[in-house]
């Protein structure tokens, strides 16, 4: 039987950085609330969580990179909401934010989690920020906890 390697869901003693886009803050504030709730319920201490607010999703990768390079965090959580409009702006912002976060994640040596909603409508965003479809902020924070504990097994 092969050995299974999995991460636990304990945030005790772990340090988390959260980068949140202010644009569409009626959604991103709910995502942040879900992420903080997940971290606290999983044992994270208030003093081990820092939140950086950026103007929009496009700016998240730069601050994520700086936070990752600081060595202060075990994982980063990137949160925001990009809602499709009538121009191609949505496509550019989504593509560059996701590429930037992936780039930081691969170079950082720590989990950098993607929690940016990319939806066609405001209603879809609201559903994913704490109503019908759960709270993706919570989901991404739980993923960060699991990934921190999994990654530690490879040191």
UniProtKB/Swiss-Prot annotation:
The keyword Transferase applies. 5-amino-6-(D-ribitylamino)uracil binds at residues 23, 57-59, 81-83, 114. One of its GO terms (cellular component) is riboflavin synthase complex. Keywords: Riboflavin biosynthesis, Transferase. InterPro entries: LS, LS/RS, LS/RS_sf. Its EC number is 2.5.1.78. Disulfide bonds: none annotated. It catalyses: (2S)-2-hydroxy-3-oxobutyl phosphate + 5-amino-6-(D-ribitylamino)uracil = 6,7-dimethyl-8-(1-D-ribityl)lumazine + phosphate + 2 H2O + H(+). Transmembrane segments: none annotated. GO terms for biological process: riboflavin biosynthetic process. (2S)-2-hydroxy-3-oxobutyl phosphate binds at residues 86-87, 128. Pfam families: DMRL_synthase. It comes from the Bacteria. The active site is at 89 (proton donor). Pathway: Cofactor biosynthesis; riboflavin biosynthesis; riboflavin from 2-hydroxy-3-oxobutyl phosphate and 5-amino-6-(D-ribitylamino)uracil: step 1/2. One of its GO terms (molecular function) is 6,7-dimethyl-8-ribityllumazine synthase activity. HAMAP family: Lumazine_synth (MF_00178). Belongs to the DMRL synthase family. Catalyzes the formation of 6,7-dimethyl-8-ribityllumazine by condensation of 5-amino-6-(D-ribitylamino)uracil with 3,4-dihydroxy-2-butanone 4-phosphate. This is the penultimate step in the biosynthesis of riboflavin. This is 6,7-dimethyl-8-ribityllumazine synthase. It comes from Desulfatibacillum aliphaticivorans.
């Amino acid at each position: 039987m092969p050995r299974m390697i999995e991460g636990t869901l304990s945030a005790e003693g772990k340090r988390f950085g959260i980068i949140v886009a202010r644009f569409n803050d009626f959604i991103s504030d709910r995502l942040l609330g879900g992420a903080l709730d997940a971290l606290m319920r999983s044992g994270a201490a208030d003093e081990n969580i820092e939140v950086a607010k950026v103007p929009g999703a496009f700016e998240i990768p730069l601050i994520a990179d700086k936070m990752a390079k600081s060595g202060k965090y075990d994982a980063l959580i990137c949160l925001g909401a990009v809602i499709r409009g009538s121009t191609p702006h949505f496509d550019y912002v989504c593509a560059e934010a996701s590429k930037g976060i992936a780039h930081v994640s691969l170079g950082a040596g720590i989990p950098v989690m993607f929690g940016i909603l990319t939806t066609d409508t405001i209603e879809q965003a609201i559903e994913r920020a704490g109503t019908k479809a759960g709270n993706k902020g919570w989901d991404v924070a739980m993923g960060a906890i699991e990934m921190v504990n999994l990654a530690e097994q490879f040191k």
